[in-house]
From Swiss-Prot:
The gene is nadK. It is an enzyme of class 2 (transferase). Its main location: cytoplasm. Keywords: ATP-binding, Cytoplasm, Kinase, NAD, NADP, Nucleotide-binding, Transferase. Its EC number is 2.7.1.23. The keyword Transferase applies. It comes from the Archaea. It comes from Methanosarcina barkeri (strain Fusaro / DSM 804). One of its GO terms (molecular function) is metal ion binding. This is NAD kinase. One of its GO terms (cellular component) is cytoplasm. GO terms for biological process: NAD metabolic process; NADP biosynthetic process.
């Protein structure tokens, strides 16, 4: 086989997902070395390896068993993400291409060699300190429910817009089918290097979604005193910001990597998921 070492990481709170992991381990453990992520291994009663250490162990790809959230959590643990193959045990699943009944056959094919697509990510900085890297989106929302915030968005040195809104979403092409789409933003092909800026329930009708080049440096500042906001990164981690804070977004040097499945067409897949 071309692939010698793989990793596997799963959502651990659903028995059917753990059952699928056991099935994968039983089928492939004698043919390829499998490193099981620590939380998953604890449920299985075996020795585990942190996802963030799998690259140094020589792992060539990670099988993520769960939904989109599981994929995002796995990617977030790695500075330079390994290729991910997602097994869809969730609901909609834009980041998980393989259905449970096809898992063994697909993994069998992938073990003989695979290609992957790079997906841009965005580094998030607060007052010059890097917080996280987003694969899907950065959402900035009011810290208090049902309250609007006022903020300015700059692209480079140019003011893009001064907004009063419930918030704003900055999405990668990968994240354009998530929160940004629900807020009225466009769907962007992952082959396009761009960042989508989508106001959430803006006060003025002239505040519209924008698509800007991925190499742009974006700056966000709150402009109303005594109001705080929250930055949510991929729906996983959040940070509070206040009036004098400066948020900057920059394209990351380290993309996410998704294993290509031969019969996968982005446009057909999106249409299928949305119907």
């Amino acid at each position: 086989m071309a692939i010698k070492k793989i990793g596997i990481s799963a959502r651990c709170d659903r028995p059917e997902i753990i059952g699928k992991v056991r099935e994968i381990l039983a089928h492939f453990s004698s043919r390829v070395q499998i490193f099981v992520a620590t939380p998953t291994a604890e449920v299985l009663g075996m020795e585990g390896t942190p996802v963030e250490r799998m690259r140094e162990e020589g792992v060539e790809l990670i099988i993520s068993v769960g939904g989109d959230g599981t994929v995002l959590r796995n990617i977030a643990k790695m500075k330079d993400p390994l290729p991910i193959l997602g097994i869809n045990m969730g609901t909609l699943g834009f980041l998980v291409d393989v259905e449970p009944e096809d898992a063994l056959e697909t993994i069998e094919e992938v073990l003989y060699g695979f290609s992957y697509s790079d997906r841009m990510r965005v580094d998030v900085f607060l007052n010059g300190e890097m917080l996280e890297t987003a694969t899907n989106e950065i959402a900035i929302m009011s810290a208090k429910p049902a309250k609007i915030i006022q903020f300015e968005v700059y692209v480079g040195d140019c003011l893009l817009d001064s907004m009063r809104a419930d918030g704003v979403v900055f999405a990668t092409p990968t994240g354009s089918t998530a929160y940004a789409m629900s807020a009225g933003g466009p769907i962007i092909s992952p082959r396009v290097n761009a960042i989508v800026v989508v106001p959430v329930a803006p006060f003025k009708l002239s505040s519209r979604p924008w698509v800007i080049p991925s190499d742009s440096e974006i700056t966000i500042r709150l402009s109303a005193p005594k109001k705080e906001a929250v930055i949510a990164i991929d729906g996983q981690k959040s940070y509070r910001i206040k009036l004098d804070d400066v948020v900057k977004l920059k394209k990351s040097r380290f993309p996410a990597r998704f294993v290509r499945i031969s019969d996968t067409c982005f446009y057909e897949r999106v249409q299928r998921k949305l119907t």
